[in-house]
Amino acid sequence: CIRDREKSDALGAMDKFYNDAYSLISSKEAREAFDMSKETDKMKERYGQNQAGQRMLLSRRLVESGVRFVSMTYGGWDMHQNIEAGFNKQGPELDQAFATLISDLDERGLLDSTLVMMSSEFGRTPKINKDNGRDHYPRVFSVAMAGGGIARGQVYGSSDAFATAPEENPLLSLIHI
């Protein structure tokens, strides 16, 4: 029956996908990429001895080992209360780690072939709320991109003076429409 064959083809493709994925993560190269003891203390300090730094260092190691797509998270940005204290802790950590990732990839000759993107799922309200935080705001937010052959030092688009709406070259996604 054709339906049985379609199911069989789909299951076979799924099996192949899972086997390929397992082969990738269980390979010698992957094990070595995840072995952070191979990095010098100086390099670990350069990225930062915190979640942002060590995750971005691991991301570089994965790219270096040939992984074609790396996604990392650095949570704790949902600051509905006391945004100043939260941002004063996380902002410098993220800034150090991201800047180091970009310069490290560039120094290793990997930046032009690696597109690095940093984004959030939405922006934050332009005004501080009653709890000294900011709430979800999908109308305006930023994405930072580097490498992958894109021009350096460019800014695309802008918001109005109060960051309440896109002003120049707005980009939309179906998620936010």
Regions found by a protein language model. Give the residues of each.
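Ligand-binding pockets and gating/stacking loops
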Residues: 3-175
